[in-house]
Design a protein with these regions (language model features):
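Helix-terminus/linker motif at the lipid-water interface of multi-pass membrane proteins
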Residues: 26-48, 117-126, 182-191, 250-283, ...
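Hydrophobic alpha-helical segments of membrane proteins
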Residues: 26, 30, 103, 107, ...
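N-terminal transmembrane alpha-helices
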Residues: 5-37, 41-42, 58-70, 74, ...
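Short runs within selected transmembrane alpha-helices of multi-pass transporters and secretion channels
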Residues: 68, 138-157, 165-173, 194-209, ...
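Small-residue hotspots at the loop-to-helix junctions and early N-terminal turns
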Residues: 44-55, 132, 136, 195, ...
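Transmembrane helical elements of multi-pass membrane transporters/channels
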Residues: 16-35, 138, 172, 201-205, ...
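Small-residue-rich hydrophobic transmembrane alpha-helices
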Residues: 47-107, 149-165, 271-337, 369-392
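Short alpha-helical transmembrane segments in multi-pass integral membrane proteins
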Residues: 1-21, 75-142, 186-243, 299-365, ...
Length: 452
């Protein structure tokens, strides 16, 4: 049971915020895995094209997420200051900003889809490129819908209600799976069917959560969407937090693409092993990632209330819980490695690599990952976004990308090189964020402008 000496959030409040977040991330990941398996039944070209486009889509989604994060922090601080009117005004500007940005990104990707894919993935087979172009066109149409849904879900979390986004997300994911079953296996529409199913599920999620936001009696109530007009002072506050976060997230996704291109140089058995390791390692991170998302709301509310010491207290508490979850999920996933490798049909060589690397990850990760990724959310919630951006982007490119290239291309470390670089990246972040957190400069920062 969560115990806290803070006054803004009881243990029950924290459980109500965090448990649905954990459930949502796990469910979404499971549905994403099922989605990939279903598309794979269409053929290698289809699953390869979808995989390539998803790598680009993730970069775009990070841009929308960054704007939503900026809005979450601003709204959470308004709510902490007991200014519900300010929080509702800011929420309207978050929706407007994300809608415009996501619509422009979607239009650009639709018009330039061939140029974008040719630039990022130059040497793919024509069948893969054709599948990717089809998938990119349809999924780009969904950008405004997934952007608005993400912003609306973030606003619910800022208000301390993560249960509704969880339920809407679950419904959308189930619709996507059902749509895949119909479009892929009944109508046999191939990649077009997979993209259409994804887009329709995102439209539904967006429509449902906007309808829910209109209900009176909630902390944040949104209605008359077409009457929303820009409030540049609020938009500036949101983007002051959102832009550095967007740069940080964008650099992270680009760095992942660079690492993927380096891994592609390895033998087939190691590439297959690395794909499985990535999936399993992600599952060990999800509960702690949910803790980090919740901490943005918790620390933001504390800072808005003028109680930085409570923000510090909750950050330490939730980092400890993040540590515990990393240990528990790591052990559980490691115990499942052999059965998963057997069921997935991995070769013996690939399976041996997966078992060895997951043991190493299970041992190393608890020492560095929680400190690398949990306290940084409190820094962002306090407005210390530039420091977070510089540390994260610098560590990603210097250690995860450059060190990975050196270890694999020049020293022949194989998959082990990927994870050595990853561990060094995590350790570097942990050191910088711990120092920043302990020194306390973030506790004296402000997101809300004085005249608000």
């Amino acid at each position: 049971m969560l115990k806290t000496k803070g006054t803004l959030f009881t243990g029950r409040d924290l459980r109500r915020l965090l448990l649905p977040l954990i459930a949502e991330l796990i469910f979404t990941a499971l549905m994403g895995t099922a989605d990939t398996v279903m598309v794979a039944r269409v053929g290698d070209a289809a699953v390869s094209g979808v995989s390539l486009v998803d790598a680009v889509n993730n970069v775009m989604l990070m841009v929308f997420t960054a704007t939503s994060t900026g809005g979450t922090i601003v709204c959470a601080q308004f709510l902490g200051a007991r200014d519900r009117e300010g929080a509702n005004r800011a929420a309207r500007q978050v929706l407007l900003s994300v809608a415009v940005i996501s619509a422009l990104c979607g239009l650009a990707c639709m018009l330039l889809r061939r140029q974008i894919l040719s630039l990022v993935f130059r040497d793919v087979e024509q069948s893969v490129m054709d599948a990717g172009l089809t998938y990119f066109l349809i999924t780009a149409i969904s950008y405004p819908f997934i952007g608005i849904y993400g912003a609306s879900a973030a606003l619910y979390r800022a208000a301390g209600n993560s249960r509704r986004p969880m339920l809407v997300s679950a419904g959308g994911n189930l619709l996507n799976i059902a749509g895949n079953a119909v479009f892929l296996f009944v109508f046999r529409w191939g990649v077009f069917g997979a993209a259409l199913s994804t887009t329709l599920s995102r439209v539904l999620q967006c429509a449902v959560i906007l309808w829910l936001h209109r209900k009176p009696g909630q902390v944040i109530v949104l209605d008359k969407y077409l009457a929303i007009r820009p409030d540049w002072k609020l938009i500036r506050m949101i983007l002051r937090v959102g832009i550095p976060t967007g740069v940080e997230n964008g650099m992270f996704q680009l760095g992942r693409l660079m690492v993927q291109s380096t891994v592609a140089l390895l033998p087939t058995a190691e590439i297959a092993a690395q794909a499985m390791i990535n999936t399993l390692e992600y599952f060990t991170s999800m509960p702690s990632m949910a803790i980090g998302l919740g901490l943005v709301t918790v620390a933001g509310r504390c800072m808005g209330a003028g109680k930085p010491e409570e923000a510090r207290h909750y950050t330490i508490l939730l980092t400890l819980y993040s540590e515990l979850l990393v240990i528990l999920t790591g052990i559980l996933i490691y115990l499942a490695v052999n059965p998963v490798c057997t069921l997935s049909g991995l070769s013996r060589e690939s399976a041996e690599i997966v078992v060895k690397m997951m043991l190493l990850i299970t041992i190393v990760k608890p020492f560095v990952w929680p400190l690398a990724f949990t306290p940084s959310n409190a820094l962002r919630a306090a407005g210390d976004v530039k420091f977070s951006m510089l540390v994260s982007a610098g560590s990603m490119w210097i250690f995860r990308v450059v060190l990975c290239v050196v270890l694999i291309r020049y020293l022949g470390f194989g998959v082990l090189g990927v994870w050595i670089a990853m561990f060094v990246d995590w350790a570097d972040r942990a050191v910088w964020f711990t120092i920043r957190f302990v020194r306390g400069k973030w506790m004296r920062m402000h997101v809300l402008e004085p005249d608000f």
